[in-house]
Each structure stands twice: as structure tokens, then as C-alpha cells.
Amino acid sequence: YPIVCTTKRTVSKKYKGGVSDYNKIKRELTMLCKSHPNEHVTTMFDYYAMPENTPEIGLHDPDIYERIGKIEAAVNRDIGQANCMFHFMLHEFEGILFSNPESFELIAETDVVNKIREIRESYPTPEHINNSPETAPSKRLEKLIPNYAKIKNGTLISKDMGIDKILAECPHFREWI
């Protein structure tokens, strides 16, 4: 069963998302790994906008898969728990939604779906879609679909396209699964 990792704790509330410090991630994952020593602990953090103090995050290997593999390995070494398998989404969850542009027909007009298809066809895989903070997959979707709701629409679209389509289009995600 999934456990949602918290990124901040107060006396009255736990927070998730919006990671500002790698050490918070490390602390939470180390605690989870030690609390569940006979279970695998994995993550689904967005690579886009990870904190600067994440091990090896500054690597600039031109091959995104080589780069992300090195960063994930460095994080796993730093956490130092045998049952931890750190995984980054390339570049963020919304990237995998570009696996099947036709699924956007559920929430968008044909002209928008065509623009999403054009974006997808401009990259080797959906995992390559990201040029800058302004052109991250979620930013592109929010620009094209003004009422785009990340959780609601992302869930609807990913369910429509199905896991097999995502696995076929996204090698890093497939390797993780």
C-alpha cells in the first residue's frame, strides 16, 4: 500500500509536495525505510525543480536517462538504506500525460489536442518534454487548458490512456515499474 511522504510537519498538520530541501526528503525516507525494513520504499518525485542540495542534481549529462540514473544512484547511496529505491519522474508527472495526446479529448477541444500532439511529436519521448520553468509539461498544459486541474484532470487522462501506453512511451517510468 502506498504511504505518502510528508515534506513538512507541524504539531497539527503534515504537508506533501513542494519540496524545498533535500534533507527533508532524506529524513522522511530514512525513517520510512527503517520503519518498514522488510518492504521496498520507492518514490515518485518530480525531477523538475528539485532542491539544489539534492546529491548530483547539478549534473549536465546530455543524455537525460544517463543523468537521471546517476542522480538516483547518488541519492540512494546518500540515503543508505538497502530497501530504498529513489525514483524521479522525468520531468514531472504531467510529462507522462503526453504519452497519448488523444486522451486529452476528454477535457479539451480538437485544436488544443492537436497542439498537445505537436508538442509530443517534437520530442523523442514524453519524458524529454521540458525546456525551462515556463515550458515544463504542467505549465504547457495550464497555458493550453486554462481550467486544467492537475489532480482531477491528470487522473482522468492517465486512466483513459492506460498504463500500457505510458510504459510504451516512457522508458524511465517503465524501468521503475
Regions found by a protein language model. Give the residues of each.
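C-terminal accessory helical subdomains adjacent to catalytic cores in phosphodiester-
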Residues: Y1-S12, K26-I177
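Non-catalytic terminal and connector segments of soluble metabolic enzymes
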Residues: K13-Y22
